[in-house]
Regions:
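Membrane-embedded alpha-helical bundles of polytopic integral membrane proteins
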Residues: 1-178, 182-206
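Functionally important transmembrane alpha-helices
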Residues: 212-218
């Protein structure tokens, strides 16, 4: 199976799940899809930064904590600040990872702790922000636009880069990325944003494209 076919299949699955979660306005579907994103995203982060290689159960616990953070912030965004007490167990988790780090290798402790906390912010934290947009029907289209534009940027960058790519964007970090691919992704993201929000808001597509590219390089 070619890389293009794989990207098309997974891209269609990704878009389909996101559309179902955001357009059906069914809280259960939304929570399942985005909770799955939080779990898998945190798990993948652990793989990327090589945390808990000797303790795989910690990966599961950290990924589950990201899902809980997403759920708790959804309840607060949906029902009000009175439900902020739902964050208490998550505060307990943060205390746990601080204590846990004490029993790690002393030399690696600061680095490992920073990786875990940043992963929670990078995945669980940013997905939790989505709750602010989702619970407000007037701004939920912005949330949809962000995810569709990210997919459009990735697809446009791949198609342009694989066919026209000549000038490397950042070869020391990502040898396959090119300026042509970046421009292709930028155009695709701007078009997607313009179609969903109106052309006067297409600057959002520029921001999304740049942020997505930097995120990949990071």
């Amino acid at each position: 199976m070619s890389n293009l076919v794989k990207r098309a299949i997974f891209g269609s699955l990704y878009v389909g799940l996101i559309l179902a979660a955001l357009l059906l306005r069914e809280h259960l579907v939304y929570m399942i899809v985005f909770g799955l994103l939080a779990f898998l995203g945190t798990w993948e982060w652990s793989n990327l930064v090589s945390t808990h290689r000797l303790f795989p159960l910690r990966r599961i616990f950290d990924a589950t904590a990201a899902v809980y953070l997403f759920w708790a912030t959804h309840e607060i965004a949906d029902k009000g600040i009175a439900y902020a007490a739902f964050l208490v167990p998550y505060a307990g988790y943060l205390l746990y990872i601080l204590v846990r780090s004490i029993y790690s290798e002393r030399q690696a402790m600061p680095t490992d702790l920073a990786k875990v906390i940043f992963g929670q912010i990078y995945v669980g934290g940013f997905l939790s922000i989505a709750n602010i947009f989702y619970t407000d029907t007037d701004t939920s289209i912005i949330l949809l636009t962000i995810f569709v534009s990210i997919w459009a940027n990735d697809t446009g960058a791949y198609l342009a880069g694989s066919t026209l790519g000549r000038h490397k964007l950042f070869p020391s970090v990502s040898p396959k990325k090119s300026w042509e691919g970046f421009l292709g992704g930028l155009i695709a993201a701007v078009v997607a944003t313009g179609l969903l929000l109106g052309w006067e808001q297409c600057y959002i597509g520029v921001i999304i494209s740049i942020a997505a590219t930097w995120g990949d390089l990071f």
